[in-house]
């Protein structure tokens, strides 16, 4: 009979279930047989339906922190949780069946409630933008790093050591004293048996090209010419060694003035290997001995940098033209060896100022230097003649140098026909 068969089946099932429960109470879940654990877990799973299996399938890529199991949960949870060693069931039961856990939304609510009691740690509200999002940003709002870079690009001209008001007078007095000590002999070329002024002019013109090739400072060129003249004032040199003297002088000047002077091998190279490295170093040693290691010689360039501070207002073209005229005076030993560098610088500054702006030697420099326009006149007349003949001079390296935009093309300016003296 169907009814009796169903009833007997239910009784047999309940008996079997009670036996399984007794086995679970008497057997350690960790040592239970695999088939018993599987049957218990499967039976419980069937009793709960298919929803847990679907949730398990979605949790298989859970973070590692979700795989940890608490001992308390194992002891207090259903028996089949501890019995099963399948990761999927463990993940599912640990998340879903533990009624003691606080849902994430409850945790957030409790944290917010706790923070709400303390105003000092309360979370701020949503911030609003200070300006509309579509408002165009002003170009002045730049990052500090970008502003620093722009400042560096604008300040291309290095700060002069002469621009120290507290020491202007002391610096000028010291330079005026040293220029007398470091002045070459006026007529030394007459005592040279094998070289002439024209050979010296060719050497200086070549040194101008060397300075441009290696991007050396103008001061380096002025120092090198001073070393050459002082050396030739004391030593007789054959024409075959004159370039060696100039190379050693340029090497010394670059070591004294430049941050990164060219290597000795570079100076050997620019002589087209006419001299060896050993010869250059030996000549450098000899020049140092003859000069008594006095390398800090005042130059026309140094005095010009002092005179430029007295421009009202400052004019870059005047400065470039004065530097051009100062370098022209390096080419010809006669007549410029008889003038002090401070006097040549004064004549160059006045001639440049007059050519560009029509102004004259300022009164502030009369008080500072003691040079009046009348005292500058002899040197000024010689420099004016040199300026007029510069385009026809045999040596053209200085004119080519000052044609560049870096120096505002001042060598292309027409010199004045007359002077206001």
From Swiss-Prot:
SUPFAM superfamilies: Cyclin-like (SSF47954). GO terms for cellular component: cyclin A2-CDK1 complex; cyclin A2-CDK2 complex; cyclin-dependent protein kinase holoenzyme complex; cytoplasm; cytosol; female pronucleus; male pronucleus; nucleoplasm. GO terms for molecular function: cyclin-dependent protein serine/threonine kinase regulator activity; protein domain specific binding; protein kinase binding. The modification Phosphoserine is found at residue 5. Polyubiquitinated via 'Lys-11'-linked ubiquitin by the anaphase-promoting complex (APC/C), leading to its degradation by the proteasome. Deubiquitinated and stabilized by USP37 enables entry into S phase. Ubiquitinated during the G1 phase by the SCF(FBXO31) complex, leading to its proteasomal degradation. The modification N-acetylmethionine is found at residue 1. Transmembrane segments: none annotated. InterPro entries: Cyclin, Cyclin-A_N, Cyclin-like_dom, Cyclin-like_sf, Cyclin_A/B-like, Cyclin_C-dom, Cyclin_N, Cyclins_cyclin-box. Residues 1-60 are annotated as: Disordered. PROSITE patterns: CYCLINS. Gene3D superfamilies: Cyclin-like (1.10.472.10). It is found in: Nucleus; Cytoplasm. GO terms for biological process: cell cycle G1/S phase transition; cell division; DNA-templated transcription; G2/M transition of mitotic cell cycle; positive regulation of DNA-templated transcription; post-translational protein modification; Ras protein signal transduction; regulation of DNA replication. Keywords: Acetylation, Cell cycle, Cell division, Cyclin, Cytoplasm, Mitosis, Nucleus, Phosphoprotein, Ubl conjugation. Cyclin which controls both the G1/S and the G2/M transition phases of the cell cycle. Functions through the formation of specific serine/threonine kinase holoenzyme complexes with the cyclin-dependent protein kinases CDK1 and CDK2. The cyclin subunit confers the substrate specificity of these complexes and differentially interacts with and activates CDK1 and CDK2 throughout the cell cycle. Belongs to the cyclin family. Cyclin AB subfamily. Interacts with the CDK1 and CDK2 protein kinases to form serine/threonine kinase holoenzyme complexes. Interacts with CDK1 (hyperphosphorylated form in G1 and underphosphorylated forms in S and G2). Interacts with CDK2; the interaction increases from G1 to G2. Interacts (associated with CDK2 but not with CDK1) with SCAPER; regulates the activity of CCNA2/CDK2 by transiently maintaining CCNA2 in the cytoplasm. Forms a ternary complex with CDK2 and CDKN1B; CDKN1B inhibits the kinase activity of CDK2 through conformational rearrangements. Interacts with INCA1. This is Cyclin-A2. The gene is CCNA2.
